Amino acid sequence: MRDESGLLRVFMASKSDGYPVIYADAPLAIKNEAFGVSELIEINGKSDPYRVTAYRDEAGNLRIVQYAKFNKYWSLGSDSEIESSNPTEYVVFLIAGQSNAQGMGAAAKSPSVNPGIAYQYYGGNLTPVLGDPVGNASTGSAWPAFANEFYRRTGLGVVFIPAAIGSSGLAAIASLPANGGNGQNWSGTGTLRGTAIARYNDAISALESGGFAYRFGGVLWSQGERDARCLPSASNKITEQDYKNEFSNLKSYFSETFGEKFVWILSQTGGDDAGIDAQGLADMRRLQREIVRSTSGVYFGWNGAYNLIARGLMRSHDFPNDPDNVNRSHYSQQGYNEMGTAMAVVASAVAIGNS
C-alpha cells in the first residue's frame, strides 16, 4: 500500500499457515461517510476467500487497509494508528451480585472505551459507556475492560444492565442486618431479582426503540462474600446446601425471562485483606466450583481474585487511607481490569459459539 506521503509500505505477509502477519491491531472499520470514508475499493486476492479492502478518506488519503479471511478481520491505518468503528450488533449482559460486581476501584485507572462500543441501561436511560463509572458505582469497575476485550475478540458491542447491589446476599438470612447485611438479597423473598428483570425488560424496549440489533449474552455474576460470612465455618447462619439451593432458585427465576439456554459467567469470590472469615471464603470458593461443575450453562469467567492479596492488588493499593472495612474485600482497579478482561474472554467464546 502507499501511505499519505506516497511511500510504498508492506502492511502484512502470509506465513506458511495462511494467517497474516500485521503491524497494527485494529478493529473492523466502519463503511460510512460519517466516519470519513468516501470511497471503498475492494481487491480480490489470488486465493479466495482472501480480500483486501482500502478506504479513501475525505481528503483523498488512503487511510485503512483491511484483510479478511474466513470471517476473521485484521485492519490498520496507513500511519499504524488504531482505526475504530461502531459495531453493527450488540450483546446484552445483566450485571448482578454485590459490590465487586458494581466496582469499588479507582475510576481514573480504568480504561476508556471508544464511542459506540458499549452502552448501559441505567436510571431509565440508554447511554454510551465511555469509561467508568458504570451503573450505580461511583468508582472504577470491571466493565470498561470487559467491553474493550469483548469487542476486540468479536467485533460486537455490549450493552450492560447494571443491577448489582453492594453487600447484598443470595440467601435472605445472610442479608439480615443482624448478620452484617443491609437487608437486600437475591432470594425469592427479596426485591433484587424482580428489579433486575424489570430493568432488563425496560432495556430491551429502549434497544428496540433505538433500532439496535441485539441478542442476550447472559448474566455477569460476582457475589459470595456476604453469604460466605454466614456459612457454618464462619457465623453458622446458613448451610452450604442453602446457598446452592438459592443459586438454583435464582437461575430458574431468570430462566423464565431469558430462557433455559442463557449463561452465567461467574467471578469467583476472593479473600479478605484483613484475614477475617478466611475459612468461610475458602468454603464459598469451593461451593462455587461445585456449582460450576454441576450446573449447565454456568461458567467461571475469572478465578484471579484470591491471588490479589498476595500480589498486593486489593483496594488498599489504590486507597491506602480508606477504612479497612471498605478496603478488605474489594479490589484495586488493576484487579477489576483483570476481572473484566478475563470474563470477556469467556463471554466472547460463548457469543461466537465456542462454549
Regions found by a protein language model. Give the residues of each.
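Short, isolated positions in well-ordered beta-strands
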Residues: R9, V21, D48, R63, ...
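Short, low-complexity N-terminal tether/leader segments at secretion or assembly junctions of large
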Residues: M1-E39, A54, Q66-S78
